[in-house]
UniProtKB/Swiss-Prot annotation:
Lineage: superkingdom: Viruses
Name of the molecule in the record: Photosystem II D2 protein
Organism: Synechococcus phage syn9
Enzyme class: oxidoreductase
Binding-site positions, chlorophyll a ChlzD2: H116
Record-listed Fe cation binding positions: H213, H267
Residues that bind chlorophyll a PD2: H196
Gene: psbD
Keyword Metal-binding annotated: yes
């Protein structure tokens, strides 16, 4: 008589780590968490440190921290000095040579926040891929999140890479972002760029679709309970629909003459519109990085220059852009020591 014993296969360290990372817990970690959590922690921590303590006097000639008297709307982690070019500004690099205070003064925190922030966003998208696979659903959440990632990377990384230095990227702050928007308008005529137009249409169109969808569902909820409001009548385990798609279709058919009759197509459209808006605006920013022009109506500018009585909204905007450049550049780029004589400052028919 012979007996045999089956030994359990030995599990390597990778399998043990894989099980631990994917364990069911309140906050899922996963393999993506190894990228997401450290980089997000460092990016947010760097931003809080910069807005609290670090001045922008040496890079922009500005006060930008709570310590100097700025508030939540005016504080920022400012871009590095123009002289730094596209240096990664590593703490141990030749610019700072391990001196933390000097590193902060040169704008090293901005490079730190931008780099770790980009990897944190990528980690968050990978997190959505990972959880989608584990739960057994399609990865459209992650695909949609590529929109914000495209905007962040194009605005904060690709645009300044196309310009002379990181200095021309947006600083991380509310008022600082507004300054960057004015800069894009004055130097690139951004609002007339077709990719900006598509971006606006996508974002506002997505908001409109979301509002229409929300009110339509609320309007067509089944009266299926005796409670004071319809929310309490909902049961997460109910098998039947909670609203009437047929009634919604009938309503919008009467309003517009057309309506969605397919829920899957409807929700894909709600996904597609805002994400395409983010993607197209990102493409436009890449164009600005290369200083590409869009919609220069030179014939109107020439006629306006020759005829004092001829002016269009376009020519008026061109004059406003000239004003932005002329009055903004000396303050925005103090290191250039710009001095514009009075006779070159823009004057239009209405200015």
């Amino acid at each position: 008589m012979t007996t045999s014993t089956l030994q359990a296969p030995t599990r390597g360290w990778f399998d043990v780590l894989d099980d631990w990372l994917k364990r069911d817990r309140f906050v899922f970690v996963g393999w993506s968490g190894l990228l997401l959590f450290p980089t997000a922690y460092l990016a947010i921590g760097g931003w809080l440190t910069g807005t609290t303590f670090v001045t922008s006097w040496y890079t922009h000639g500005l006060a930008s921290s709570y310590l100097e008297g700025a508030n939540f709307l005016t504080a920022a982690v400012s871009t590095p000095a123009d002289a730094m070019g596209h240096s990664l500004l590593l703490l141990w690099g030749p610019e700072s040579q391990g001196d933390f205070i000097r590193w902060c003064q040169l704008g090293g925190l901005w490079a730190f926040v931008a780099l770790h922030g980009a990897f944190a966003l990528i980690g968050f998208m990978l997190r959505q891929f990972e959880i989608s696979r584990l739960v057994g659903i399609r990865p459209y959440n992650a695909i949609a999140f590529s929109g914000p990632i495209a905007v962040f990377v194009s605005v904060f990384l690709i645009y300044p890479l196309g310009q002379s230095s990181w200095f021309f990227a947006p600083s991380f702050g509310v008022a600082a972002i507004f300054r960057f928007l004015l800069f894009l308008q004055g130097f690139h005529n951004w609002t007339l760029n077709p990719f900006h137009m598509m971006g606006v249409a996508g974002i506002l169109g997505g908001a409109l679709l979301s509002a229409i969808h929300g009110v339509t569902v609320e309007n067509t909820l089944y009266e299926d309970g005796e409670q004071a409001n319809t929310f309490k009548a909902f049961d997460t385990t109910q098998e039947e629909e909670t609203y009437s798609m047929v009634t919604a279709n009938r309503f919008w058919s009467q309003i517009f003459g057309i309506a969605f009759s397919n829920k899957r197509w409807l929700h894909f459209f709600m996904l597609f519109v805002p994400v395409m808006g983010l993607w197209t605006s990102s493409i436009g920013i890449i164009g600005l990085a290369l200083n590409l022009r869009a919609y220069d109506f030179v014939s109107q500018e020439v006629r306006a220059a020759e005829d004092p009585e001829f002016e269009t909204f376009y020519t008026k905007n061109i004059l406003l852009n000239e004003g932005l450049r002329a009055w903004m550049a000396p303050v925005d780029q103090p290191h250039e020591n710009f001095v514009f004589p009075e006779e070159v400052l823009p004057r239009g028919n209405a200015l």
